[in-house]
Amino acid sequence: MGSTKPRTSAQASAPKVQSLPEKTFIIDNGAYTLKAGYAPGFPPPEDLGQALSACSTIPNAIAKTRGNRIYIGAQLNSQVTDWNEMVFRRPVEKGYIVNWEAQKEIWDNAFFDEKTVRSKDLRIESPEDTTLVLTEAPNALPTLQKNADEIVMEEWGFGGYVRFVGPVLNAWNEVQSLFGDPIGQDSSSPISPKQCLLVVDSGYSHTTVTPVYKGQPIQRAIRRLDIGGKHLTNYLKEMVSMRQYNMVDETYIMNEVKEAVCFVSNNFAGDLEQTWQGNRKRGLTDAAEGITVDYVLPDPNTGKKGFMRPHDPLSNAKKRKSILSGGNAEALSEDVLILGNERFTVPEILFTPSDIGMKQAGIPDIILQSLSVLPTGLHPSFLANVLVVGGNTLIPGFLERLESELRQIASAECVVRVRRPHDPIRSTWLGASRLAANRAELRKFAITRQEYQEYGSSWAGRKFSGIL
């Protein structure tokens, strides 16, 4: 009987793992918009405007007009003129992709179909030669994560892939200057994450609090408030529909109204007292008039967009007088919303969810809940580095109110600093682009197509969660 020769080490070793494709495409897959584009090379641009120029914002929706015309994704930015009674179908619900059929249609339209891609900078010509960085909301269900991984790697066949918890990527941004800390990192050295960062992400579907330590989320400390921009818009629709015009079917228009007029009050009880209608009988109208504004609704017949203007309490009387005298036809055709306490009671639910009957704590309290599960020694570092991102943080007064309330409930010895990046909507994408510039760091998190085919989606899920 012949003896079997032992296998050499070269024969026993696994096949050489492929390196990641050089091109890296980033999709911050938000519920309201996609933030997408190719990551720049190393070193990334120091100028913020130049760095963000590679990122495009695309509506993450399929919409149908009252004339039954369909618009997909980027078409909503360029082709729609009449937003009245527009019906939206969104693939993301409560922060997670739950309808991949619709999401695939939007991605195909925005990135893959040569006929519909609006810019060559957004075209993914060869997925097999591209690494995809895809964001997800914290604490996604494993089934939803597996669906995403299988579609990305099996449907499109990307050469490299990594799925990140979105808020975490903000740790790779240059946030030291926001907090007034010295920038100790040389522009030519590899980019590394900030050591301690508490990210408050208030977007379309929800608000999350994510403590990030050395580039990794502390999972047990992540907290979520089920209120986002969608809920603010719906609340405003209800209030206006009860008090003035029926705007229940005008989601887009009321979202525009919300962005134009709402603010977070630093003296809620005082502002509410000022705008109380009973004050008119007592002659206390001056302060209320400073809060109350008019919003002229858009006119699809003339193409005129909606806009805010100071409230004129005599406008109705002037309008009646103009009708009698045959006055300006354009002014007579205006539909105007008069907005007083609606301006600040709507965003107030981010801080006091009980106002609408929700049994959840507001943003300042869930930040303290998040820190309560961490070692006490870390509390000062996180409270001194609170970064707010997401569209809701652009509401005037949000930053000041959050910092004020945190100071009131935090330990007296802790310094509280709350900062917002220059562009809180695209900040997560920017962080991903800076991480992608550090190829060695990206390789720690990402997988290649060869690895996915060899080990499968379950292994990929463990890799992305940091278990491997």
From Swiss-Prot:
CDD domains assigned: ASKHA_NBD_Arp6
Q: Which domain of life is it from?
A: Eukaryota
Residues of the signal sequence?
none
Pfam family name, one: Actin
Its chief place of residence is cytoplasm
As for subcellular location, the record says: Cytoplasm; Cytoplasm, Cytoskeleton; Nucleus
Keywords, in A-Z order: Activator, Chromatin regulator, Cytoplasm, Cytoskeleton, Nucleus, Transcription, Transcription regulation
**GO cellular component entries:** cytoplasm; cytoskeleton; Swr1 complex
For this chain's UniProt record, which GO biological process terms are given?
A: chromatin remodeling
The record's GO molecular-function terms, alphabetically, read: nucleosome binding
| Assembly and binders | Component of the SWR1 chromatin remodeling complex.
Q: What does this protein do?
A: Component of the SWR1 complex which mediates the ATP-dependent exchange of histone H2A for the H2A variant HZT1 leading to transcriptional regulation of selected genes by chromatin remodeling. Involved in chromosome stability.
State the family named in the UniProt similarity comment for this chain: Belongs to the actin family. ARP6 subfamily.
- What's the name of the protein? Actin-like protein arp6
Q: Which organism is it from?
A: Aspergillus fumigatus (strain ATCC MYA-4609 / CBS 101355 / FGSC A1100 / Af293) (Neosartorya fumigata)
Q: Which gene encodes it?
A: arp6
